[in-house]
């Protein structure tokens, strides 16, 4: 007997991105028009994929409040789309980085130079008193820390960016059968969807709730009952180590229980780095 199975599609979007910049190449506005293919019906978080992407189109760039995003989601005869490896971030990152390359060509700037002019600066993560207050982006989310220019400079040094540019100029002559391309990208990852007011404001699963119970048994052993069910993440080891450290006992004295609704009836999901 032959069994066949299928799963979700991870990507299904048509994106139109427009950038505005001043004469020095600094971004002043971003407009995104998105058509999202939902597939034949909604899966777990099908509409959430373009919604998460909406927070990520600015990338790691210091974008002012001029951000215009609109998404139209449509049902089609295709397999449903849903969260798979990034859930909105790969689509948004691809779009903004391709748009940055196009802007660099239009302004006759090196693509890396354009990015350097627009990175969120390290000092923007600190308040006037020198406290690390984080950077609040145009959409209201707060990024706690970052030094994007330093990270990029280190990457470019290791990649010998200037040397590769010279090789590109030599190799990409008219009529060449092989041409050398250079790509660069950086991004924020929106993951770890823990209980939060942000998720609640999006009407997402009661704010991304989760449950856990710790019991000290008469035998002096400890039980940790978790609503997240592991499938390769190593929850049993990690939860036992965390509980043991906090309670001052050996991890061998901690039992982690999961995946049984008779024991742990309350649990949302294990995905998107929201457990480990």
Description of each model-found segment:
Residues 1-3, 44-59, 83-118, 141, ...:
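Alpha-helical support elements that line or immediately flank enzyme active sites
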Residues 1-3, 28-33, 61-64, 111-120, ...:
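Beta-strand segments within the central parallel beta-sheet cores of soluble alpha/beta enzyme folds
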Residues 1-23, 81-106, 133-162, 267-276:
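Glycine-rich and small/hydrophobic secondary-structure elements
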Residues 3-8, 34-39, 48, 120-122, ...:
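Acidic, glycine-rich active-site loops and adjacent beta-strand->loop/helix elements
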Residues 8-10, 21-54, 97, 106-153:
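Molybdopterin (Moco) oxidoreductase catalytic core of the xanthine/aldehyde oxidoreductase family
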Residues 14-98, 196-210, 270, 274-276:
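Glycine-rich loop/linker segments at domain edges
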Residues 67-78, 214-218, 257-267:
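Flexible hinge/switch segments at interdomain interfaces of large molecular machines
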Residues 121-221:
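Helix-loop-helix junctions that connect adjacent transmembrane helices in secondary transporters/permeases
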């Amino acid at each position: 007997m032959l069994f066949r199975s299928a799963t979700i599609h991870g990507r299904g979007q048509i994106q139109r991105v427009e950038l505005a910049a001043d004469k020095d190449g600094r971004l002043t506005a971003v407009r995104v028009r998105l058509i999202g293919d939902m597939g034949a019906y909604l899966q777990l978080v099908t509409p959430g994929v373009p919604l998460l992407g909406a927070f990520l189109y600015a990338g790691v760039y210091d974008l002012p409040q001029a951000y215009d995003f609109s998404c139209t989601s449509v049902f089609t005869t295709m397999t449903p789309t849903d969260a798979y490896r990034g859930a909105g971030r790969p689509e948004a990152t691809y779009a903004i980085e391709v748009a940055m390359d196009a802007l660099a060509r239009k302004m006759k700037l090196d693509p890396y130079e354009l990015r350097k002019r627009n990175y969120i600066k390290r000092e923007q993560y600190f308040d006037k008193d020198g406290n690390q207050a984080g950077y609040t982006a145009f959409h209201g989310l707060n990024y706690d820390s970052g030094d994007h220019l330093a990270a990029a400079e280190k990457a470019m040094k290791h990649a010998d960016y200037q040397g590769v540019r010279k090789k590109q100029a030599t190799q990409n002559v008219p009529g060449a059968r092989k041409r050398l391309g250079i790509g660069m990208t950086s991004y924020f990852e929106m993951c770890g969807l823990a209980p939060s007011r942000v998720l609640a404001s999006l009407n997402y699963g009661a704010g991304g709730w989760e449950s856990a119970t710790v019991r000290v048994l008469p035998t002096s052993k400890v039980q940790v009952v978790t609503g997240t069910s592991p499938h390769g993440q190593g929850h049993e080891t990690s939860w036992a180590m965390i509980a043991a450290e906090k309670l001052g006992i050996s991890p061998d004295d901690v039992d982690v229980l999961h995946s049984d609704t008779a024991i742990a009836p309350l649990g949302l999901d294990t995905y998107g780095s929201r457990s480990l």
